[in-house]
A protein has these predicted regions:
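Bacterial Sec-dependent N-terminal signal peptides
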Residues: 1-21, 275
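Conserved SGNH/GDSL esterase-like catalytic core that processes O-acyl groups on lipids
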Residues: 22-26, 32-115, 121
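Extracytoplasmic/secreted proteins, especially bacterial periplasmic and envelope-associated proteins
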Residues: 27, 37-44, 73, 104-111, ...
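Ser/Thr-glycine-rich phosphate-binding loops at phosphate-binding pockets of nucleotides
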Residues: 30-31, 203
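Alpha-helical cap/lid subdomain in secreted, periplasmic
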Residues: 77-200, 216
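C-terminal outer-membrane/trafficking sorting elements
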Residues: 276-356
Length: 356
């Protein structure tokens, strides 16, 4: 399955590579997002590649995901809809709390992700993986040791990495692995200064890493071709772009980038279907709708055998069967609710039905 996903991502990248794209992104974070105006820096990177990023940002200093989950401003921006991506970034220390104290982080992320998917069925959630502080977190070491093993960059960064990967998997979301590239640069190019004097916030070079790390998954293009270097020297910018190519672009699946595209495409298609009026198309007819027990499908052309997929309202694949011509599907064991029928590998073939 992973090999198939990699091949599909390679094909998609090839198809979009020469195309100019426009994306709309909402950034919800704090000063790690706001410093150096990261969204505008990403937009500048995109412009240098012939692409366009339209963006909005809500990033008050010190904000947690919990703060965004109860903020009328953040919620209103999510509900305005039509975002291709909503990027979520938590306060850096929140991702290094003991396991017993992570509930609020996970529940806030789940709530925000649910709001995003409800109001942006054609969009995706992406988490902004940040980095460990330059010399670790001595305060959390004092408070939480011995669980907090050591006040080092390495320990803090490993926790942040682990938690962002877990939270993205929990929510079928993508990750922009800024912290992973940050780690690579620290190990292999220590001469590039990534931090401000506070040993926490990003320098211009640190924000440039983030900009390239976001451009790459948002547009699925090779960052080495980016011509915008901000105020960095050509050598520094090239080193960073090479690192992003190695860590991110060459390993998109590792960061969940693209692996939920099929789920999102079903949710997007379903948002544009009306259960009362869109009961058939040139590839598929379906009746009755609503349905109680047996759903009848007619697949065209009748001689073609296809994979018929049934998804629940959240985009989770719950059944896949092979069929051609007329098929009668027993759905009595399904819970009452909204479902979607999709013909695999047939673009724009998705219908909504109600089980009652």
């Amino acid at each position: 399955m992973k090999i198939i996903t990699v091949l599909l991502l390679t094909l998609v990248s090839a198809l979009v590579y020469g195309q100019n794209q426009t994306k709309r992104a909402l950034f919800l974070g704090n000063s790690y997002t706001g410093v150096n105006n990261l969204p505008q820096m990403i937009a500048n990177v995109a412009t240098s590649m012939g692409d366009t990023l339209e963006w909005e940002m809500e990033a008050p200093g010190g904000y947690y995901l919990y703060d965004h989950s109860i903020s009328t401003t953040s919620i209103s921006k999510i509900e305005s809809g039509n975002w291709d991506y909503v990027i979520l970034q938590d306060q850096s220390q929140a991702m290094t709390l003991p396991n017993t104290q992570m509930y609020l982080v996970y529940s806030s992320a789940k709530l925000l992700d649910s709001l995003i998917k409800e109001n942006n069925p054609c969009g995706e959630t992406m988490f902004y993986m940040t980095w460990g502080r330059e010399n670790g977190d001595s305060l959390f070491y004092q408070i939480y040791s011995p669980w907090y093993a050591e006040p080092s960059y390495e320990f803090m960064d490993s926790l942040i990495h682990e938690r962002y990967m877990q939270i993205s998997t929990n929510n079928n979301a993508e990750v922009s692995p800024v912290g992973a590239v940050w780690n690579y640069i620290r190990q292999n190019h220590p001469g590039i200064g990534l931090y401000q004097a506070d040993e926490s916030h990003p320098s211009v070079a640190g924000s440039y890493i983030a900009a390239c790390c976001f451009y790459t998954p948002l547009f699925r293009k090779d960052p080495r071709l980016v011509s915008f270097n901000s105020s960095l020297s050509l050598a520094e910018a090239s080193t960073i772009k090479d690192a992003v190519k190695l860590v991110v672009y060459d390993s998109l699946v590792k960061w969940n980038i693209g692996i939920y595209d099929s789920i999102n495409s079903v949710a997007c298609a379903s948002a544009n279907l009306n259960v009362n009026s869109e009961r058939q198309n040139s590839n598929l007819q379906m009746f009755p709708n609503p349905v109680t027990d047996i759903l009848t499908l007619k697949v065209y052309p009748e001689k073609d055998s296809v994979q018929i997929q049934i998804y629940d309202w959240s985009g989770v694949l719950i059944r896949e069967i092979e069929g051609a011509g007329t098929r009668r599907i027993d759905i009595r064991e399904l819970a009452n609710g909204v479902y979607f029928i999709r013909l695999k590998n047939r673009s724009n073939t998705a219908l909504k039905f109600v089980k009652n």
